Amino acid sequence: MIRGWFVGNFEPSVLKSKDVEVGVKEYQKGDYEQKHHHKIATEITAIIRGRVKMNGVEYQKGDIIVIEPNEASDFEALEDTISVVVKMPCVLDDKYLGEAK
């Protein structure tokens, strides 16, 4: 597993797939990821535990957030948080900082 990612087109992986990648992500309160976007992949985030802010909107346990290709988002953990993230398709190097141009 690499930083929580366990399904995808990378090693090590429990299921090699170009169609999807899946990860269980753990964040500590205050963790922050800069605004970024994916040109190809759709990213689905399910909040399992905790509370986060993405693009100025707060989400909590049970919420599911869908970020479409070329839609930028930042991420801040407002509490210790566990999320499950699914990206479709699995495209390596498809993360770009800032807004889509």
Region locations from a protein language model:
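Short histidine-centered beta-strand/loop micro-motifs
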Residues: S13-K16, E33-K39, N55-V57, F75-A77, ...
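Short, conserved beta-strand element in jelly-roll/cupin
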Residues: Y27, H37-K53
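Short acidic-glycine-tyrosine-enriched beta hairpin
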Residues: N55-D74
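Ligand-binding loop in jelly-roll beta-barrel domains
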Residues: P69-E99
